[in-house]
Amino acid sequence: MAQVQRMSRLMVKTLRDDPADAETLNHKLLVRADYVRRTAAGIWSWLPLGKKVLENVARVVREEMDAMGGQEVLLPALLPKEPYEATGRWEEYGPELFRLKDRKGAEYLLGPTHEEIFTQLVKDQCSSYKDLPVILYQIQAKYRDEARPRAGILRGREFLMKDSYSFDTADEGLAQSYALHREAYIKIFNRLGLDHRIVSAVSGAMGGSASEEFLAPAPAGEDTFVDCPACDYAANTEAVTFVAPAVESVEHPAVEELDTPDTPTIESLAEYLGVPASATLKNLLVKADGEIVAVGVPGDREVDLGKLGEHLAPAVVELVTAEDFEGRDDLVRGYVGPQGLEKVRYIADPRVAPGTAWITGANKINTHAKNVVAGRDFEVDDYLDVVVVEEGDPCPSCGTGLRLDRAIEIGHIFQLGRKYADAFQLDVLGKEGKPVRVTMGSYGIGVSRAVAALAEQTADEQGLCWPKEIAPADVHVVAAGKALQTELALDVAEKLGAAGVRVLVDDRAGVSPGVKFTDAELIGVPQILVAGRRSAEGVLELKDRKTGEREELTVEEAIARLSA
């Protein structure tokens, strides 16, 4: 028998107005509908209705993980420092890692992901190729000290995540485990009713090679991705690669210095000279683990520090400050040029191809130089694709202009390879009787993030609108207010429950019909069944929450329809 939840006994307190600090739709509605409450910055409590939705998402994830052969475990969230030191992630995670000490001074962390601990577990449990492949997963809270928690549960410091890990003896096995997860994720997000895109991505601090993100398009999303209208190319903006066009061989004039007073920015320089910003060469200075690096890009483009950081990893990248120019005659703030930077590593975007001519800094105050040609007047140490992707940039696959969109990351899959196995010497005895280094995959789904993404994608002006698979109930029965209507509503609710239907029934006394109807729309159960003006005749009104379609049904018809 399915549960019948009476709102007269349910701890729920809806709000008429949006929270003052709410910036996104999911934040506003999940708080107003009393699904979650803020405990501290980035830390949320899940209330009865919200916990049901969260559990339903976790159930779908668990069912599909089990179906693909995953084995569920539960590892601790409080973890020792040493395994993360062994892989370098104790430092790589930086300030996002929650660190703490016990009373004896031993250092620990709250797990952001569990690659190290799962690797150690498999090292202890598996000794032969016969023990592999194996896929282990858990659904557990994760912790990251976000600098600016925002968007409600979308970017919190504690969040619920499914993380799974595959262990194989060969790269071919890893590819199969990766494909299994990819297919399972598609099934999961389809069952949840999430519109999603699969895009190429970068691995970041996780390490490894192949990596794809599952993104849910939504205006509140913090990820930007591109897709091509002409082919199937799609990628996170940090993973987009630019194919430099061929440069015609042209004999450029000699370098000529220009008097350019008070033009330390590209905007002021372009205006002063009356040239487009694209004719200028912007030279951004950064520090990579304390070493100054110059990055050259066309003046009308911006440097993507995320991309740059990926290229320079594991070095920590930060912008230079005014103090970094002190005592450096070769670096003139606002007038840096690539020529004469022998003491500085020079990285250029592929658009700064050999043979291209630029207007750029002359390394003198109030002075620029024109006809500065890459490959003739300065050398590039490394060509790296480091510009921010823009709408209309050419697709790397077919050349068509790319489209930009915002999205919420709901899943990420990685082929890690042997990074973690190398750190812990994870070997098994192979078929030939010799040690074989294990190869590994890592796969995550943001369970609580999926709730936020669904709220963003499915809500309307009235409130939440959950898909049946994860809604807190199948039907929301509303008693309009009179005793007869309440009696009918409770009777129908019990009969529906007996038929296996999950029911939320609003039997609250002293609450106006208008408030009940508003709450039903806000809470977002997919079907709303009203015991109203025709209750004496045994007739109810059924409303589809998503489409707004209404029809009148007898009690028997309603039970037959909703229990089918």
Swiss-Prot record:
The keyword Ion transport does not apply. Its main location: cytoplasm. One of its GO terms (molecular function) is aminoacyl-tRNA deacylase activity. GO terms for cellular component: cytosol. Keywords: Aminoacyl-tRNA synthetase, ATP-binding, Cytoplasm, Ligase, Nucleotide-binding, Protein biosynthesis. Its EC number is 6.1.1.15. GO terms for biological process: prolyl-tRNA aminoacylation. It catalyses: tRNA(Pro) + L-proline + ATP = L-prolyl-tRNA(Pro) + AMP + diphosphate. InterPro entries: aa-tRNA-synt_IIb (IPR002314), aa-tRNA-synth_II (IPR006195), aa-tRNA-synth_II/BPL/LPL (IPR045864), Anticodon-bd (IPR004154), Anticodon-bd_dom_sf (IPR036621), Pro-tRNA-ligase_IIa (IPR002316), Pro-tRNA-synth_IIa_bac-type (IPR004500), Pro-tRNA-Synthase_IIa_type1 (IPR023717). It is found in: Cytoplasm. The keyword Nucleotide-binding applies. Homodimer. Belongs to the class-II aminoacyl-tRNA synthetase family. ProS type 1 subfamily. Consists of three domains: the N-terminal catalytic domain, the editing domain and the C-terminal anticodon-binding domain. Catalyzes the attachment of proline to tRNA(Pro) in a two-step reaction: proline is first activated by ATP to form Pro-AMP and then transferred to the acceptor end of tRNA(Pro). As ProRS can inadvertently accommodate and process non-cognate amino acids such as alanine and cysteine, to avoid such errors it has two additional distinct editing activities against alanine. One activity is designated as 'pretransfer' editing and involves the tRNA(Pro)-independent hydrolysis of activated Ala-AMP. NCBIfam families: PRK09194.1 (NF006625), proS_fam_II (TIGR00409). This is Proline--tRNA ligase 1. The lineage of its organism: Bacteria, Bacillati, Actinomycetota, Actinomycetes, Kitasatosporales.
